[in-house]
């Protein structure tokens, strides 16, 4: 207990009570003034910061690679699919493979390209280009070369 409280308890006089009441009323008035807002205030809100769309040049360079491959067996199809998953375009030359294995690779890569939202196009005899969704193929060159018709496989 502080000395002022003890003093007030034992030696309380009417003048001191009146002074205490006056200071209490003054504190209450000051608090009301602080709580009452002025009638009109100009309130300005900070502008919302918009997020800028900035693409690093490094990122653009990384996503625009073309990989040239010449697989010899069907087991290399998964490696080709990994390039596509890495957002790289792939040109595949299947001329050194048997026709049966080449058809299997094209079927596998067609499914892979479909799954990633890309595209596959024939660009030459037994040559295909597979692209992920970030690469667009424009134009067609199939009419420019004389393709040998393979009578055994009608799909190609």
Curated annotation (Swiss-Prot):
Its main location: cytoplasm. Homodimer. Interacts with FtsZ. Residues 37-48 have a biased composition (Polar residues). Cell division protein that is part of the divisome complex and is recruited early to the Z-ring. Probably stimulates Z-ring formation, perhaps through the cross-linking of FtsZ protofilaments. Its function overlaps with FtsA. Belongs to the SepF family. Keywords: Cell cycle, Cell division, Cytoplasm, Septation. It comes from the Bacteria. GO terms for cellular component: cytoplasm. This is Cell division protein SepF. It is found in: Cytoplasm. Residues 23-48 are annotated as: Disordered. Residues 23-36 have a biased composition (Basic and acidic residues). Coiled coil: none annotated. Gene3D superfamilies: SepF-like protein (3.30.110.150). GO terms for biological process: division septum assembly; FtsZ-dependent cytokinesis.
């Amino acid at each position: 207990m502080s000395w002022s409280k003890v003093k007030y308890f034992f030696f309380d006089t009417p003048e001191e009570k009146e002074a205490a009441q006056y200071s209490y009323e003054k504190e209450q008035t000051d608090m009301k003034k602080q709580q009452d807002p002025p009638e009109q205030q100009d309130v300005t809100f900070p502008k919302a910061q918009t997020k800028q769309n900035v693409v690093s040049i490094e990122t653009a360079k990384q996503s625009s690679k073309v990989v040239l491959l010449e697989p010899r067996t069907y087991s290399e199809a998964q490696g080709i699919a990994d390039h596509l998953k890495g957002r790289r375009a792939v040109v595949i030359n299947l001329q050194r493979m048997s026709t049966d294995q080449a058809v299997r690779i094209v079927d596998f890569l067609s499914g892979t390209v479909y799954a990633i939202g890309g595209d596959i196009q024939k660009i030459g005899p037994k040559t295909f280009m597979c692209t992920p969704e970030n690469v667009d193929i424009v134009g067609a060159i199939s009419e420019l070369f004389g393709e040998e018709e393979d009578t055994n496989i009608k799909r190609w």
